[in-house]
Regions:
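Cyclophilin-like peptidyl-prolyl cis-trans isomerases
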Residues: 1-133
């Protein structure tokens, strides 16, 4: 399992959209289509090739929190083009700071993240409150 703490303070719209997609089951069964060693794993694309999305875009919500190892951010082609694709950093990535929406961090299961390979599937994502952990 991978447990991600979401940041609704610095990325409220992204967090809301991510939670809404989870509630709809959007991510269940999707794959991690891109794995770049020592950089990121990327998933959340319904097409599975890096070109798909949810049919809407989100505004870029740049935060002052750094992209350290385990940071969760939104994929974009340019500002304000985020959708459903997200990435998890495998190492510290300071060049991403203030450039991408960082909306969460892995708090448990980073060993699992580091073993992911392209094509591995998201079996299911569920929302757990901190009280339920």
């Amino acid at each position: 399992n991978i447990i991600i703490r979401l940041d609704g303070y610095y990325a409220p719209f992204t967090t809301d959209a991510f939670l809404s997609a989870i509630e709809r089951g959007f991510y269940n069964g999707l794959n991690f289509h891109r794995v770049v060693p020592n950089f990121v794993v990327q998933g959340g694309d319904p097409r599975g090739d890096g070109w798909g999305g949810p049919g809407y875009t989100l505004l870029t919500e740049r935060s002052p929190i750094e992209f350290n190892c385990g940071a969760v951010g939104m994929v974009r082609t340019e500002y304000d083009t985020e959708g459903s694709q997200f990435f998890i950093t495998l190492t510290d990535q300071p060049q991403l700071n203030y450039q991408y929406t960082r909306f969460g961090e892995v708090i448990c299961g980073m060993d699992v993240v580091k073993r992911l390979e392209a094509g591995d599937r998201i079996l299911a994502i569920s929302v757990v409150t901190m009280d339920e952990r």
